């Protein structure tokens, strides 16, 4: 591993007091630990046609998408009063490809859960994922809110105050493309192109649309991953029950998400639940920052039909 690292470009996050060194592998930035997991997944993971991949860049709605998808596919076994989501962090319910290849394989033997989560760019997914023709769901979000969410998540993870970790520096990292699994625009573009080529295999979900029109988008999600709601379920309010159970307000209020850490984990569960709001960036961005990031996103996403403002 050390020999591989020596050949890769490096970036040190100065705003985190040099506590993170990122390496550029296959045109995206990642940590040493996640690179090790990425290499293992690329070399050994065998996808199945029945798999459903939940794909995202960090801090774009991953936790929410996982919760909704898990509740949808397990609703025959659990309801809003018995779901494992009420007792475990959602990331313990849906395995993460870059860390849990063996657990994913074990799940196939012990349960029928088809869900796998990943932050990998489309071009860096294991070849078996593309070859298997399995379905993927990609969630994306306004980059300005992504920057703010990422800032607070990492700042609190490393126990730094806002004075110790200037927001201006994390903004510059993102603007220059030096973010985890970034550049962010490249991450979006990779999945966007693939979704246009294979619309029946890749569902594009916008975080803000999921917030503003949850019922129609949760129905869309369920149909796409092969677990559509029946007319009886719709009449019985099953969709609304799932939305309420998986809401930020509900999950963030659970004791498990206030005080605990996942088994073997270092981060407190509460770090995954900060605000769950749109537009918090307005409390952090200067006009100059807004203009800079809007300009580069307009340039990068030109012609894609995507709007992230």
Curated annotation (Swiss-Prot):
3'-phosphoadenylyl sulfate binds at residues 59-64, 141, 149, 207, 274-276. The active site is at residue 119. InterPro entries: P-loop_NTPase, Sulfotransferase_dom. GO terms for molecular function: sulfotransferase activity. One of its GO terms (cellular component) is cytoplasm. Its EC number is 2.8.2.-. Keywords: Cytoplasm, Transferase. It is found in: Cytoplasm. The keyword Transferase applies. Its main location: cytoplasm. PANTHER family: SULFOTRANSFERASE SULT. Belongs to the sulfotransferase 1 family. This is Flavonol sulfotransferase-like. It comes from Flaveria bidentis.
């Amino acid at each position: 591993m050390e020999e591989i690292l020596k050949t890769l470009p490096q970036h040190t996050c100065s705003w985190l007091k040099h506590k993170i060194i990122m390496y550029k592998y296959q045109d995206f930035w990642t940590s040493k630990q996640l690179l090790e997991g990425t290499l293992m997944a690329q070399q050994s993971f065998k996808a199945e046609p029945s798999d459903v991949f939940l794909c995202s860049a960090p801090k774009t709605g991953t936790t929410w998408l996982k919760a909704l998808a898990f509740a949808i596919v397990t609703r025959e076994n659990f309801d809003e009063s018995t779901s494992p989501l009420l007792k475990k962090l959602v990331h313990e319910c849906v395995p993460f490809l870059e860390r849990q290849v063996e657990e994913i394989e074990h799940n196939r033997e012990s349960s029928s859960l088809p869900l796998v989560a990943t932050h990998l760019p489309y071009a860096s997914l294991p070849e078996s994922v593309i070859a298997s023709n399995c379905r993927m769901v990609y969630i994306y979000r306004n980059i300005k809110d992504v920057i703010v969410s990422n800032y607070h998540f990492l700042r609190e993870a490393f126990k730094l105050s806002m004075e110790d970790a200037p927001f201006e520096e994390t903004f510059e990292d993102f603007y220059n493309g030096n973010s985890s699994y970034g550049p962010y625009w490249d991450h979006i573009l990779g999945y966007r192109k693939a979704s246009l080529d294979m619309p029946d295999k890749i569902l594009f979900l916008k975080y803000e649309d999921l917030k503003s029109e949850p019922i129609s988008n949760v129905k869309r999600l369920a149909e796409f991953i092969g677990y559509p709601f029946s007319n009886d379920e719709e009449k019985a309010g099953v969709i609304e029950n799932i939305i309420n159970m998986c809401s930020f307000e509900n999950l963030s209020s659970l004791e498990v998400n206030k005080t605990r850490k996942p088994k073997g984990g270092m981060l407190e569960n509460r770090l995954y639940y900060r605000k769950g709001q749109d537009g918090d960036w307005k409390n952090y961005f200067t006009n100059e920052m807004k203009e800079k990031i809007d300009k580069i996103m307009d340039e990068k996403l030109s012609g894609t039909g995507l709007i992230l403002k």
